[in-house]
Regions:
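Helix-loop-helix hairpins and the membrane-proximal interhelical loops
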Residues: 9-76, 128-149, 236-248, 405-460
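Glycine-rich, mobile lid/loop segments that gate access to catalytic sites or pores
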Residues: 171, 179, 183, 187, ...
Length: 540
């Protein structure tokens, strides 16, 4: 009995006769008008929401300089997400375009809409995971000149690298240069203050993020290849393994599968990648307008009462574990520990003292919304140091607390995170608009590379569906665990994996370029951001 599955050489032959999609059609005037209308509306909405938040806290504006710096920083951060949109999301639409499942411009708009929804419905876990990589002293003083230099340096470095790889048509990662830029700023900051360069980065967090970025293309390649082989074994419909004929769309069920996976990748990309910009925007807002954004002022008053109660029992447990007197400056002890990861005998008493101090302050105010504007920044900084110290102590096994004390510490950390790790709706909307509109600009270069230059023959339906499915699930899983991952690397390596599994052949010139970009991105971004940080600290 013969199998109904097409042999690999037959698939390759059929793929070679496929018709390429027409990508040169320009959008009409109405499309351009809608694009700029949405862009203008988003900017005006963001500006209005920002001013409304400042008005709500009753703060008097004495100088417009912080708002000018804030505006520039926010535009650069949103610019990063805009570039991220057309740089990364082109990968999501390449398969539906090259299989004629959707017309090119409709596919791009469709992807942009689901990127938008992905950002709006994201959890925020990735956003604050990115911030944890930054040097602690710059996080605590992000509103200073050095803090602005940090933000400008890492964002400009990431944008320049993304634009460079896009210009060359390379589907390189947008996450890689951002992580490299953060590391570069941390190393430069440490060296400029006379410390070992490695002390400027939380290498435990950086390693965790690095594994997710470095392993994701390998996962994409292997899993997409295995999924294609499993499809050939289990699904006997020959139409699935053919390349498109002419400009005709595929059978309805194949078309639906490809559109579904494209939609899933777009949504997952928005949910994961959009958070990187949100995290940096929140860092900027907290540094420049702490009275409005340092603490979540929308939390009900009973949450403040619970916060104070948990702080009190946590302090008592810590004092019981280490009854020695608290140091004169507990904040400095915790700051030194968070920066150096070296525990001193004063660490636990310092943590107990600061925990009690935070609890008493919140209890005295009665609600987070009643914390005075001039105290907001200090209260948040104390909370940040306490939360990070608890996280690192738990990770490193410092203190050897009993189960009850560990539980109280984690409960208090969760209360702190609830009060400090929040993202206003307008920030999500602004990032969603930037990422969604970016999806609709400049996508052709990357689409051509993914659709034509990775494998020798034309992409088949099964190959497109396999690569997209693996990308969707991988990015979704990373988002669930709060890890940044590269949509580009997962999907382009998935396409390569299906070509290899099918015996179709790879275009090794493109593969070499992709590997070179993969290897060079981190060191190049580190060097570029470190240089920019040094230069900007001299100018500010």
């Amino acid at each position: 009995m013969t199998s109904d599955v097409l042999p690999a050489d037959a698939v390759a032959s059929a793929a070679g006769n496929a018709h390429k999609p027409h990508l040169e059609q320009r959008p009409g005037r109405l499309t351009a008008l809608v694009f700029f209308a949405v862009l203008a509306t988003g900017l005006l909405f963001s500006a209005y929401s920002l001013m409304q938040d400042v008005d709500d806290v009753g703060s008097t504006i004495t100088t417009w300089t912080p708002f000018l710096l804030l505006g520039v920083a926010l535009l650069i951060a949103l610019g990063f997400e805009f570039v991220n949109g057309f740089h990364d999301t082109a990968n999501a639409v390449a398969t539906v375009i090259y299989t004629h499942s959707l017309p090119p411009h409709f596919a791009v708009v469709w992807s942009g809409c689901f990127n938008f929804l992905g950002v709006l419905l994201s959890s925020g876990a990735v956003a604050f995971g990115i911030i944890a990589l930054l040097p602690v002293e710059l996080i605590l003083q992000v509103g200073s000149s050095a803090g602005f230099a940090m933000v400008f340096a890492l964002l400009i470095a990431a944008i320049l690298w993304n634009l460079g790889t896009w210009w060359l048509g390379l589907p390189a990662s947008s996450s890689h240069p951002l992580i490299g830029s953060i590391i570069g700023v941390g190393v430069a900051n440490a060296l400029m203050h006379g410390r070992d360069g490695t002390s400027g980065v939380d290498w435990g967090q950086a390693t965790k993020v690095g594994y997710s970025l470095l392993l994701s293309p390998l996962i994409g390649f292997a899993c997409a290849a295995l999924l294609l082989l499993a499809l050939r074994l289990l699904v006997k419909n020959r139409a699935l393994y053919k390349a498109p004929k002419g400009k005709a769309p595929p059978p309805w069920w194949i078309r639906g599968l490809l559109i579904l996976t494209c939609t899933g990748v777009s949504f997952a990309h928005g949910s994961n990648d959009g958070q990187k910009g949100m995290g940096l925007i929140m860092l900027i807002l907290v540094g420049t307008l702490p009275m409005a954004y340092a603490l979540n002022r929308t939390m009900p008053a009973d949450q403040a009462v619970q916060f104070a109660a948990v702080a009190e029992v946590t302090q008592q447990a810590l004092v019981k574990s280490a009854p020695q007197p608290a140091p004169a400056d507990p904040r400095q002890v915790l700051s030194d520990y968070v920066r150096s990861k070296q525990a001193s005998p004063e660490l636990i008493p310092a943590l107990a003292a600061l925990t009690g101090s935070i609890g008493q302050e919140v209890k005295g105010y009665g609600a987070f919304s009643r914390v005075p504007a001039e105290a907001m920044g200090n209260v948040r900084n104390d909370m940040y140091l306490t939360s990070e110290a608890i996280r690192l102590m738990d990770k490193d096994g410092v203190g050897r607390f009993d189960a009850d004390t560990r539980g109280k510490l984690q409960a208090f950390k969760q209360k702190i995170d609830d009060a400090t790790k929040f993202i206003p709706l307008w920030v999500k909307i602004a990032v969603a608009i930037a990422l969604g509109l970016g999806t609709m600009v400049g996508w052709k270069r990357i689409v051509v590379t993914v659709g034509e230059k990775i494998g020798k023959p034309h992409l088949t339906y099964a190959q497109g569906a396999s690569a997209e499915t693996v990308a969707m699930l991988t990015i979704g899983a990373a988002d669930l665990y709060g890890l940044p991952v590269s949509t580009t690397h997962v999907l382009s390596s998935g396409v390569a994996g299906t070509m290899a599994a099918n015996g179709s052949g790879l275009q090794w010139k493109t593969i070499r370029n992709l590997l070179m970009a993969w290897v060079l991105t981190l060191p190049a971004a580190i060097l570029l951001s470190a240089s920019l940080y040094w230069l900007l600290t001299r100018l500010f």
